[in-house]
């Protein structure tokens, strides 16, 4: 049996803040764009059963999930469109932004295969969209998934490293999704590209929640955090445990904040994937509860201003 989508109105938000910038979410239109991973029926994924989200999720649906929360800006992250559709996805997102309040999604992180011979052409095409801010090419998802794909080989590709180093000249950042086993190797690569702004997705995906696994994750995270151009997204907390555990979220998020510092972390919803396990209201209530003892300026940094600055979002 598939997971049930949570009720977006089920949990009230008790803590009030001026504004939220959602640093990580997704949209999709299955009628216009091919998403092979999402459209495969009856296939379980590392984040759980995708059946409930195998339907269109447009900007209007995202806004409905947001409800009354003061989300004034958002950052869309590419979501695995089939290769011919990667630029089409960005063009569609730009059109969605033109139809929504506040222009959501205000920033677009698009896909480009940085190893492809036509990568520069793809980057040029993506740049036609005014909301483009960065590129994501996933380096690691989960150990079992990565063993069946070529993503783990990207770090060994000279072409990948060369094109990665070219992103700053295009005023583009890089969203980095990987697993803890790759943190050290990636840190070595990024140390050679100090002018590249990098956003680490999902706290570095701590898939092994054992004491040894968490210690290994913390060690890798600490190594990556030595690079001042790398920021950390506090998101994707249900990717491996497949339930919303506020205490686990608190422990993971506060560890990342302690390692990276308040000024280099930002919260994201990872909706609608996270919607499999939690409502938007409960998600942000948990986020605000875990930083309840922080100062007002620190809360704003984590909830809004860090993402606004990183992705160059206008007020």
Please tell me what each predicted stretch does.
Residues 2-9, 84-181, 231-240:
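Active-site gating/metal-coordination segments in enzymes
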Residues 17-19, 69-75, 101-107, 129-133, ...:
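Short, well-ordered coil/turn segments that N-cap beta-strands
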Residues 20-30, 200-203:
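Histidine-centered catalytic micro-motifs
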Residues 1-23, 32-65, 73, 255, ...:
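Mid-to-C-terminal alpha-helical segments outside catalytic/metal-binding sites
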Residues 150-266:
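Catalytic pocket-lining loop regions of alpha/beta-barrel enzymes
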Residues 42-55, 60-82, 103-113, 133-140, ...:
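Divalent metal-dependent hydrolysis catalytic cores, especially in the metallo-beta-lactamase
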Residues 52-53, 81-87, 112-120, 145, ...:
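Acidic-and-aromatic substrate-binding clefts and catalytic sites of carbohydrate-active enzymes
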């Amino acid at each position: 049996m598939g997971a049930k989508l949570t009720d977006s109105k089920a949990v009230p938000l008790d803590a009030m803040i001026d504004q939220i910038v959602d640093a990580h979410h997704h949209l999709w239109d299955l009628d216009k764009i091919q998403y092979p991973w999402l459209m495969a029926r009856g296939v379980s994924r590392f984040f759980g059963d995708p059946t409930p989200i195998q339907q269109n999720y447009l900007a209007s649906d995202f806004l409905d999930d947001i409800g009354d929360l003061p989300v004034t800006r958002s950052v869309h992250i590419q979501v695995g469109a089939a290769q011919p559709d990667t630029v089409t996805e960005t063009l569609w997102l730009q059109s969605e932004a033109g139809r929504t309040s506040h222009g959501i999604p205000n920033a677009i992180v698009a896909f480009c295969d940085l190893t492809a011979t036509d990568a520069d052409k793809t980057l040029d095409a993506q740049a036609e969209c005014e909301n483009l801010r960065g590129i994501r090419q996933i380096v690691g998802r989960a150990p079992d998934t990565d063993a069946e794909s070529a993503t783990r080989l990207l770090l060994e590709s000279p072409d990948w490293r060369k094109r990665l180093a070219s992103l700053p000249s295009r005023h583009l950042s890089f969203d980095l999704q990987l697993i803890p086993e790759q943190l050290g190797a990636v840190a070595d690569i990024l140390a050679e590209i100090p002018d590249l702004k990098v956003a680490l997705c999902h706290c570095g995906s701590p898939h092994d929640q054992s004491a040894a696994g968490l210690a290994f994750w913390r060690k890798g995270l600490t190594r990556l955090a030595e690079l001042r151009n790398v920021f950390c997204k506090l998101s994707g907390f249900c990717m491996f445990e497949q339930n919303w555990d506020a205490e686990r979220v608190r422990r993971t998020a506060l560890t990342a904040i302690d390692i990276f510092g308040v000024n280099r972390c930002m919260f994201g919803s990872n909706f609608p994937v996270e919607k499999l396990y939690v409502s938007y209201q409960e998600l942000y209530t948990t986020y605000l509860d875990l930083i309840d003892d922080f100062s007002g300026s620190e809360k704003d940094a984590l909830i809004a201003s860090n993402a606004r600055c990183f992705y160059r979002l206008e007020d």
